[in-house]
From Swiss-Prot:
CDD domains: CMP-KDO-Synthetase
Source organism of the structure: Chlamydia caviae (strain ATCC VR-813 / DSM 19441 / 03DC25 / GPIC) (Chlamydophila caviae)
Keywords annotated in UniProt: Cytoplasm, Lipopolysaccharide biosynthesis, Nucleotidyltransferase, Transferase
GO molecular function: 3-deoxy-manno-octulosonate cytidylyltransferase activity
Pathway assignment: Nucleotide-sugar biosynthesis; CMP-3-deoxy-D-manno-octulosonate biosynthesis; CMP-3-deoxy-D-manno-octulosonate from 3-deoxy-D-manno-octulosonate and CTP: step 1/1; Bacterial outer membrane biogenesis; lipopolysaccharide biosynthesis
Primary gene name: kdsB
One Pfam family here: CTP_transf_3
Signal peptide: none
UniProt GO cellular component terms: cytosol
Name of the molecule in the record: 3-deoxy-manno-octulosonate cytidylyltransferase
Amino acid sequence: MKKQVFASKKVGVLPARWGSARFTGKPLASILGKSLIRRTYENINQSIALDKVIVATDDQRIMDHVLDFGGDCVLTSPECANGTERTAETISRYFPEAEIIVNIQGDEPCLQHTVVDALVRKLEEFPEIQIVTPVAKTTDSHEILTNQKVKCVFDKNGKALYFSRSPIPHILKKETPIYLHIGVYAFRRNALFNYIESSPTPLSQAEDLEQLRILEHGGSIHVCVVEAKSPSVDYPEDINKVEKYLTCHSSASF
């Protein structure tokens, strides 16, 4: 049988695995009558910058579900250690012509396609940038203090200096801005595969943040400051928070 390949040059990949330690079967969790993965897919599929949006999964149940609602999906290896590895496998096997790849976490059901479009535009406008990711300003003390939310500091040119689960920078003055990292990355093709070929690093393992591996190997990640900040789903109890958010933002296209 002929191998399926796509000619798309700008691709959004939604990695979705069944066996999450924190929330088994999370992609199929229902949120106001639609699955988490469907909500994420349908939001991102409105993108005007991407040629293709595709779910990459290691589980037939997820694939069947995505195909049932009319989405595109491919099966990947269960050996992938994280979403970036699953994204890279998808691009390597199915998208030989892809130049810009956006890795979109499947647990972001409220993420708007405009965020993805902004990242793609950044890579198109600035050829020297290899990787770009969104951040959003916060004043919420819980978000700042919890280790479930990743914070980012960056220089005056928008280049990330560090990502941490701890509050950074340390706040001596109330007006100091704090930025939350949103788990979406736009890569140039070479940058994605350079990450895959790199070895794990001490800080990335200490913080359990894969993006630190790029910084520790001397790579650069640029940030794109966005207004949109919405809840993600990490645990079963987050479903209720997301449903409340969607109910309050019912005028948005969810």
